[in-house]
């Protein structure tokens, strides 16, 4: 089997349809569609490939999961820039539509907050925050920087937070 954890539906669909034809000599394919990011999208097509999509509000998140379900995704993948509210909306909508959830630990959350709500925690990036002796202080600092970010690339914001708090 092959699991694709981030790509735009319009680019994935032709390949997946070909691989899923009855006479295809191909592995089973499970796909999530785009990375579900927050107001700021890391993989926005600027300096990195466009494989993410914005979910700035709970309403956008709910609608996106319904659209992805109708597009035939096998699961969803939540990325790093979502707020706790959007994260909850995405996981609740996925549960409603019986879609498994893969996720990175969002920068706005800790592993202990996000982990219980997902089926697969990817790469364990950001898990170190929960392991630090000053976890609460580091988390508050991260939230302050996230909440004060007004515009710019999600990639830049994410990278600056990782650099700032690299352990």
Q: What residue ranges belong to the model's regions?
A:
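Divalent-metal coordination cores built from histidine and acidic residues
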Residues: 1-167
């Amino acid at each position: 089997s092959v699991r694709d954890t981030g790509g735009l539906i319009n680019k994935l669909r032709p390949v997946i349809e070909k691989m899923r034809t009855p006479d295809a000599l191909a592995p089973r394919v499970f796909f999530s569609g785009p990375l579900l990011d927050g107001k700021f999208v890391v993989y926005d097509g600027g300096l990195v490939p466009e494989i993410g999509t914005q979910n700035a509000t709970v309403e956008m998140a709910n609608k996106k999961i319904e659209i992805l379900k109708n597009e035939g995704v096998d699961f969803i993948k939540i990325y790093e820039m979502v707020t706790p509210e959007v994260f909850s909306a995405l996981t609740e909508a996925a549960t409603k539509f019986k879609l498994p959830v893969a996720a990175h630990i969002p920068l706005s959350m800790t592993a202990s907050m996000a982990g219980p709500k997902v089926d697969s925690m990817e790469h364990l990036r950001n898990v170190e925050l929960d392991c630090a002796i000053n976890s609460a202080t580091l988390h508050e600092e991260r939230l302050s920087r996230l909440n004060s970010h007004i515009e710019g690339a999600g990639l830049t914001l994410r990278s600056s937070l990782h650099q700032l708090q690299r352990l």
